[in-house]
């Protein structure tokens, strides 16, 4: 699933149907990095990559295209990946799993163009991380502190950067979640509900802004009621 307002449209077309043709169309009409799209010349440090994945997943889903460089004037360069830099996609996905919550949905796809492909894709190789958006689970938080990652941090995209969410950005995430629906889906397990509640408690304890703290308190109360419903104890009188 992806956020309905993903931009540019060529990216949305690619995400819904990730083929060689839609990738070419996206790259040939590239308008630069956005909240939903990132380019890398080569594979980068896994903690940095995990940070970008969390940010894109929280922002609505999207992709990271590996094999696209940047020229001195800021324009993109469709260099592709060398054989040495073209990694095993299963290995990439498995290693990333050590840095990401298990419910973040992502996958790596290979795009190999042969000598018959039109320029500038002739004999080029690209790899693309496709990152989905699931309103049941956002906001995704970092599960470890290592390298670029801080435990419990919520990352979002801001143009070409992946940064920690401000109070205002966190509110945007929640409003987008509500708009997409399923904010309190019964598909969540009890453990997932409890994990979300734990993160809400931690978020409340580290905030100094009164308005934001009151907002978190309201969300905590609703989450507590939802957990009581899952346990079938909602409305029971205390003894």
Q: Where are these predicted regions, by residue range?
A:
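Short hinge/gating elements
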Residues: 38-42, 75-82, 144-146
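Intrinsically disordered, low-complexity regulatory tails
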Residues: 103-196
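Short, charge-rich binding segments
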Residues: 56-57, 98, 116-121
């Amino acid at each position: 699933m992806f956020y309905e307002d993903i931009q540019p449209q060529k990216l949305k077309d690619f995400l819904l149907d990730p083929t060689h043709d839609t990738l070419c169309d996206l790259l040939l009409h590239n308008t630069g990095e956005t909240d939903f799209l990132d380019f890398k010349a080569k594979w980068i440090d896994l903690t940095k990559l995990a940070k970008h994945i969390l940010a894109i997943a929280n922002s609505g889903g999207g992709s990271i295209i590996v094999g696209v460089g940047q020229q001195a004037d800021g324009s993109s360069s469709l260099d592709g990946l060398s054989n040495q830099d073209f990694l095993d996609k299963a290995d990439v996905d498995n290693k990333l799993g050590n840095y990401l919550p298990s419910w973040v949905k992502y996958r790596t796809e290979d795009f190999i163009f042969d000598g018959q492909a039109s320029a500038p894709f002739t004999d080029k190789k690209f790899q693309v991380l496709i990152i989905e958006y699931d309103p049941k689970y956002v906001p995704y938080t970092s599960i470890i502190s290592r390298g670029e990652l801080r435990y419990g941090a919520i990352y979002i995209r801001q143009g070409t950067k992946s940064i920690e969410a401000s109070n205002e950005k966190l509110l945007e995430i929640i409003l987008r979640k509500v708009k997409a629906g399923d904010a309190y889906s019964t598909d969540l397990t009890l453990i997932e509900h409890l994990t979300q509640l734990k993160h809400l408690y931690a978020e409340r304890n580290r905030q100094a802004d009164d308005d934001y703290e009151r907002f978190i308190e309201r969300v905590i109360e609703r989450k507590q009621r939802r957990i009581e419903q899952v346990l079938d104890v909602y409305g029971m009188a205390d003894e």
